[in-house]
């Protein structure tokens, strides 16, 4: 060992000496003596490794307390950190999909703080059913005879098939064999549910006679799957649920539908593209309809199944129902969200998903122009900051073809180097509240459709 190396090792402090320093008192109070000591030992090992490798001390050896504080602060951050979503995707799967209404947030807080009547019937002091309150609301909203709640729509489809068609055939059009995120495929779900998939028609054209010819003594269901995350256009043919229900009645085979996104209101009244609604399919005679709680409905992650009473009863009594059931927080949030639908005149104000989807491009552009000046003052030396029109998307596989006119703040490096955009985006991701945009066409775009808290936005970007 050289004299220089020996000198570097001698500069490493003893843990006891560090802990006696006043700057470590607050760290021990905040993070605990055990964790602080554990980290100091780790850092000493790191420092020795640096000395062995490069004959230098790490820069942080100049202020051990500051480095410990920085590391423990980062370590203490929640894995689920709040971010500012300026990607232009309203229902961003990677960012948690639907923002919850204040009523839903309050309902969850209450359910977490106190015992609740999850499965307790106050009328007869006996055991109740956890889906009962939501079933009443869903019957009222959709016109269905009964309802069942599980933890997501994939689970809803699995339960629906396992409880009503295990060991039998399910007839589906080839044009509806969808795959959603995470390689979740309808054929795979059928296999897990114990069903046999009977494909009919072609990718772009399926006729009523295709279903008719497929039905046999082992057919359990005729199934429709709403292709909410893609669109087949051009030379196409598909039969709707009403026509399929008529055929099912003739052949004595129930019809079920996986609706996917599941809007409970006609979106066209807000100037948005219309999506099929569960109540329309129930009115058409579909036996079971499944849809998501955290997409267009604007609630928590949940799988909702509405339909005929006798078929819902089969779902409720199936062993998978207990494995897939929703917890009290989900049910509390979903109930509060569904109650908002009982007052449709206030829905676009109180339901964040609908409020963000219905923001006009003109309002968003005015907001962008208002925010442009302080950002130019802060970033103008390196970037051209402009207000530009853009197109938002709904996201989470909802209305895949349709885009929403919006406005964005764009950042273009004066030197044209893409690495500067990557660096800027990375800096914003490291903020206390990360700001998430998207890089496209030589610019960093901040689509302001989902920006409601301007003060927090400026506090972050002007740091």
From Swiss-Prot:
N6-(pyridoxal phosphate)lysine modification, residue list: 295
Reactions performed catalytically: L-seryl-tRNA(Sec) + selenophosphate + H(+) = L-selenocysteinyl-tRNA(Sec) + phosphate
Entry cofactors: pyridoxal 5'-phosphate
Pathway(s) the chain acts in: Aminoacyl-tRNA biosynthesis; selenocysteinyl-tRNA(Sec) biosynthesis; selenocysteinyl-tRNA(Sec) from L-seryl-tRNA(Sec) (bacterial route): step 1/1
Entry's EC annotation: 2.9.1.1
Subunit structure: Homodecamer; pentamer of dimers. Binds only one seryl-tRNA(Sec) per dimer.
Protein name: L-seryl-tRNA(Sec) selenium transferase
Organism of origin: Shigella flexneri serotype 5b (strain 8401)
Lineage: Bacteria, Pseudomonadati, Pseudomonadota, Gammaproteobacteria, Enterobacterales
């Amino acid at each position: 060992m050289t004299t220089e190396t020996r000198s570097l090792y001698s500069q490493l402090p003893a843990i006891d000496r560090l802990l006696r320093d006043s700057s470590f008192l607050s760290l021990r109070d905040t993070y605990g003596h055990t964790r602080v000591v554990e980290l100091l030992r780790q850092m000493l090992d790191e420092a020795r490794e640096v000395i062995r490798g490069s004959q230098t001390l790490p820069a942080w050896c100049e202020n051990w307390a500051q480095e410990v504080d920085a590391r423990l602060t980062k370590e203490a951050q929640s894995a689920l950190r709040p971010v500012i979503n300026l990607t232009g995707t309203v229902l961003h799967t990677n960012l948690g999909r639907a923002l919850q209404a204040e009523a839903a947030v309050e309902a969850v807080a209450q359910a977490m703080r106190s015992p609740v009547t999850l499965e307790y019937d106050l009328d007869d002091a006996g055991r109740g059913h956890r889906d009962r309150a939501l079933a009443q609301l869903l019957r009222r909203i959709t016109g269905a005879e009964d309802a069942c709640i599980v933890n997501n729509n994939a689970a809803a489809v699995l339960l629906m098939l396992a409880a009503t068609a295990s060991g039998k055939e399910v007839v589906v059009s080839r044009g509806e064999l969808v795959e959603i995120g995470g390689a979740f495929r309808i054929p795979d779900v059928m296999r897990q549910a114990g069903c046999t998939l009977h494909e009919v028609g072609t990718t772009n054209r399926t006729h009523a006679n295709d279903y008719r010819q497929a039905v046999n003594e082992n057919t359990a269901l005729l199934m429709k799957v709403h292709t909410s995350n893609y669109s087949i256009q051009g030379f196409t043919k598909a039969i709707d649920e009403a026509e399929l229900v008529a055929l099912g009645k003739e052949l004595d085979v129930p019809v079920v539908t996986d609706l996917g996104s599941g809007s409970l209101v006609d979106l066209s009244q807000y100037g948005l593209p219309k999506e099929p609604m569960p109540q329309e399919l129930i009115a058409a005679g579909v036996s079971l309809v499944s849809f998501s709680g955290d997409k267009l409905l604007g609630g928590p992650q949940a799988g909702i199944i509405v339909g005929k009473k006798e078929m819902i009863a089969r779902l409720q009594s199936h062993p998978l129902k207990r494995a897939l059931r929703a917890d009290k927080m989900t049910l509390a949030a979903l109930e509060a969200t569904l109650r908002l639908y009982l007052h449709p005149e206030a829905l676009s104000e109180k339901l964040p998903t609908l409020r963000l989807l219905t923001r006009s491009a003109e309002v968003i552009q005015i907001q962008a122009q208002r925010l442009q000046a302080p950002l130019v003052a802060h970033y103008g030396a390196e970037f051209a900051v402009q207000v530009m029109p853009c197109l938002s998307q709904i996201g989470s596989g909802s209305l895949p073809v349709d885009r929403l006119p919006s406005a964005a703040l764009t950042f273009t490096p004066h030197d044209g180097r893409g690495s500067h955009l990557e660096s800027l985006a990375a800096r914003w991701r490291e903020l206390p509240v990360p700001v998430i945009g998207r890089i496209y066409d030589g610019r960093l775009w901040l689509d302001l459709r989902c920006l409601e808290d301007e003060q927090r936005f400026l506090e972050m970007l002007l740091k």
